[in-house]
């Protein structure tokens, strides 16, 4: 993992977590982070420990819970390192609600889908979400949540993505063509005025797609990076203000400390400082 970087300025500290085991996807998003992060932020790109079984664990509902304990430990590690914002870089927004409770007032949790849909809704109520595969008929709870949370979309076109082992797209050029085809149909047939990329593996496609279709395109990773600076600054200004913890039962600080201290530091499979 390498030594932790010591920040000596007052920039907002943002951790972008790719919730998969394996560092390959981290390299895939570096260029986007470099080009589109808020200038007032330091961004750390991370991925979960290799011990969860690799990149594909996220794809299978039966073993996906392996991620959840790891994500809790990442959240506690980020709190320990005084990060202002933790971005969950997956359009499924796994564990976003739970991590908000754990982070409390110490850190803002941003889900990529959450920010992307909010951004699209500010531009127009007529937005379409370009999905990597058919989620509407999927029994997967994470897919059902994506569809439910984007139910105000005018359409959910499917682009039939194929993935490499590290979850990057197999054919970027072909993907761009399918995105343009489905985006144009959503505009023509459903009246979409904004398109939202429905998978963070579509990162880097938004500008070409926007040129092809002529309407705004929201990349969830870019939207979250741009929102992180503002959210982090606001968090610093309002520290000690209203708690972000939800009503209901949540662990005490003592219990969270026991989890955090179960290992010296979290063994990220990859960590890139930008």
From Swiss-Prot:
Residues of the site described as Seems to be responsible for recognition and proton retrieval of D-isomers: 90
InterPro entries (alphabetical): Asp/Glu/hydantoin_racemase (IPR015942), Iso_Racemase_Enz_sf (IPR053714)
Leader sequence segment: none
Keyword Phosphoprotein on entry: no
GO function terms (MF aspect): amino-acid racemase activity
Deletion phenotype: Abolishes the production of both oxepinamide F and oxepinamide E and leads to the accumulation of protuboxepin K.
EC number(s) per entry: 5.1.-.-
Pathway terms, separated by semicolons: Secondary metabolite biosynthesis
Superkingdom of origin: Eukaryota
Keyword field: Isomerase
Functional summary from the UniProt entry: Epimerase; part of the gene cluster that mediates the biosynthesis of oxepinamides, derivatives of anthranilyl-containing tripeptides that share an oxepin ring and a fused pyrimidinone moiety. The nonribosomal peptide synthetase (NRPS) opaA assembles the quinazolinone core with D-Phe incorporation. The first adenylation domain (A1) of opaA loads and activates anthranilic acid whereas the second A domain (A2) is for activating of L-Phe, which is then converted to D-form by the E domain.
Family listed: Belongs to the HyuE racemase family.
Protein name (record): Epimerase opaE
Organism: Aspergillus ustus
